[in-house]
């Protein structure tokens, strides 16, 4: 059998080049010869990577098909603690959305309409994380847009087409892939009307944005500048159909509970009305569970916009137990992350149970939810993480409730005969 490879040192008298990248035999480790062509080892490796990626994508889409609601919920459980009702609503809505896309390929008299989602919940309750986890599970492009930066077309600020442009950038301008993506629009409550009545002045960042988002969310063909360029009349635009995209809007909707209470109290006037004392009022989370489209309209969303978001999921404020679980249990739990960082220094990090409860209490006081947990731990461990790489014979760092409260520094345990001491003693 003839050897069809060319090594760098072969003296054939003729300099050979890769037919694909143009590199000479002296610039690569090996050239493989074919009928009148050569390919180098680097191009072979690149081709293997491309094939491997395509096979993985194919396996993700074909392997088992679309995940069932139970499977979606189970995946969400690995990253999002609590919020069982919201996870169930999302699992069903996402399953039905992608089932609708499958049904569009078949000839059927029944046309399934799109069901976009509205997430209502306080800061740090897991709205963004739920959307991110869904996109990762379904292996579809995902982007986050901030509604507060959006304005009507023609005004200073981002127009709504920028959202689609970001999604296209995430999938290297693969239009077909982008058309099946998920878009999460955060802070949607900040574009509400300032009053229940339509304003006579131009509201370019409030009601104007809602009007601009209407068609995009319902399904339209958006014109996006190619490769992130600015719009000008002479250029050709990339046409993107948004009718198969899933839009998830999220917001804290501070004060919405009062709107709901007013509506429920108005409905209970007369002799048969149930009178409740101050202590008998439902919690904010329980009140939000009873939200109706009319409440959102009174809050400041225009009726047409509310109609485009038929699926509503409410998230509760996280209590101490849920925050401690978030610190410990998910795949990307903060405790596991910091323990890994310390492990890379050859040191064990021991975050005691009372310390985790104290961190949770601090986050609740600050009303930052799960988002504030990292900040608290970072502040507590900053000095230790600064000194640790320069210290020797450290085997363990212990953090208890007093450390979180600021009464003492983390305790450092040495591997040798030395006694344990606080980080500040160094």
From Swiss-Prot:
Top-level division of the source organism's lineage: Bacteria
Gene: clpX
GO cellular component assignments: HslUV protease complex
InterPro entries attached to this UniProt entry: AAA+_ATPase, ATP-dep_Clp_protease_ClpX, ATPase_AAA_core, Clp_ATPase_C, Clp_protease_ATP-bd_su_ClpX, ClpX_bact, P-loop_NTPase, Znf_CppX_C4
UniProt function note: ATP-dependent specificity component of the Clp protease. It directs the protease to specific substrates. Can perform chaperone functions in the absence of ClpP.
SMART domains tied to this protein: AAA, ClpB_D2-small, zf-C4_ClpX
Pfam family, one: ClpB_D2-small
Record's subunit section: Component of the ClpX-ClpP complex. Forms a hexameric ring that, in the presence of ATP, binds to fourteen ClpP subunits assembled into a disk-like structure with a central cavity, resembling the structure of eukaryotic proteasomes.
Family that this chain belongs to: Belongs to the ClpX chaperone family.
GO BP, one annotated term: proteolysis involved in protein catabolic process
Binding, Zn(2+): 18, 21, 40, 43
Residues binding ATP: 122-129
Name under which the protein is recorded: ATP-dependent Clp protease ATP-binding subunit ClpX
PROSITE patterns (UniProt xref): CLPX_ZB
ClpX-type ZB domain residues: 6-59
MF (Gene Ontology): ATP binding; ATP hydrolysis activity; ATP-dependent protein folding chaperone; protein dimerization activity; unfolded protein binding; zinc ion binding
Keywords: ATP-binding, Chaperone, Metal-binding, Nucleotide-binding, Zinc
């Amino acid at each position: 059998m003839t050897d069809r490879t060319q090594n760098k040192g072969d003296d054939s008298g003729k300099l050979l080049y890769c037919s694909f990248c143009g590199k000479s035999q002296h610039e690569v480790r090996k050239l493989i010869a074919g009928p009148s062509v050569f390919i180098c080892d680097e191009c072979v490796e690149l081709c293997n990577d491309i094939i491997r990626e395509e096979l993985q994508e194919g396996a993700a889409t074909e392997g088992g098909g679309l995940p069932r609601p139970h499977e979606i919920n189970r995946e969400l459980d690995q990253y999002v603690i609590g919020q069982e009702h919201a996870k169930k609503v999302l699992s069903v809505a996402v399953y039905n959305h992608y089932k609708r896309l499958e049904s569009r390929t078949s000839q059927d008299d029944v046309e399934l309409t799109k069901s976009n989602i509205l997430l209502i919940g306080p800061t740090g309750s897991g709205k963004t994380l739920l959307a991110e986890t869904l996109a990762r599970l379904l292996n579809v492009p995902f982007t986050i847009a901030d509604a507060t930066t959006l304005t009507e077309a023609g005004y200073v600020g981002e127009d709504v087409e920028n959202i689609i442009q970001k999604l296209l950038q995430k999938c290297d301008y693969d239009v077909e892939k982008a058309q099946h993506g998920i878009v999460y629009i955060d802070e949607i409550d900040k574009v509400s009307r300032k009053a229940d009545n339509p304003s006579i002045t131009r509201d370019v960042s409030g009601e104007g944005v809602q009007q601009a988002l209407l068609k995009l969310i319902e399904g339209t063909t958006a014109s996006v500048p190619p490769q992130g360029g600015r719009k000008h009349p002479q250029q050709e635009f990339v046409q993107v159909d948004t009718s198969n995209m899933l839009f998830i809007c999220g917001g804290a909707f501070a004060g919405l509970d009062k709107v709901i209470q007013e509506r429920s109290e108005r409905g209970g006037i007369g002799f048969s009305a149930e009178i409740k004392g101050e202590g008998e009022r439902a919690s904010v989370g329980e009140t939000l569970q009873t939200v109706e489209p009319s409440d959102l309209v009174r809050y400041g969303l225009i009726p047409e916009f509310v109609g485009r978001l038929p699926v509503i999921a409410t998230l509760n404020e996280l209590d101490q137990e849920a925050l401690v679980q978030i610190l410990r249990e998910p795949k990307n739990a903060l405790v596991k992350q910091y323990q890994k960082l310390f492990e890379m220094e050859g040191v064990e990090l021991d975050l005691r149970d009372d310390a985790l409860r104290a961190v949770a209490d601090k986050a609740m006081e600050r009303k930052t939810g799960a988002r504030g947990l990292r900040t608290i731990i970072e502040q507590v461990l900053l000095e230790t993480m600064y000194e640790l790489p320069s210290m020797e014979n450290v085997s363990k760092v212990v953090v208890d409730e007093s450390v979180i409260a600021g009464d003492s520094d983390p305790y450092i345990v040495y591997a040798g005969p030395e006694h344990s001491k606080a980080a500040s003693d160094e």
